[in-house]
Amino acid sequence: ASDVYKRQHYVRIGLEDGGRLVCGGRRPDDPQLKDGFFYEPTVFADMQPHMRLAREEVFGPILSVFKWSDEDALFEAVNDVDFGLTGAIWTRDLVTAHRAVRRIQTGYVWINNSSQHFMGAPFGGVKQSGIGREECFSELLEFTYSKNVNLKLG
């Protein structure tokens, strides 16, 4: 239940900071889901980069929608957070996609997709979103260490 309370807490924060709740923001009405950890997919619009909901890792079905007209301002705001686990870029233009991938400061980026993992592809964040990579050979190396041993013979 604490996970559900965390979602409710972030919805309150989003509303208090001036975000506009477009949909969701509550537990489902379905009686079969009332006792679980379910929370409706939630979308906030009219968000600003300084809002807490936009600056923290929520790890829940809560989406903040922003509007920009200047690409430099967009990436400045996107990268001006303490976290950088994942990012999703939605575009019809591959040139735009590649430019965005170079500019976004996250450890994992999807283009026209979200939340899909690929076997063997390193997964992990930058900044306060952790260190190291999971789901790849590098993950195994995280559990080892190198040791240099020198032996003088004679």
Q: What are the functions of these language-model segments?
A:
Residues A1-Y5:
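Short, small-residue-biased leader/transition segments that mark boundaries at the very start
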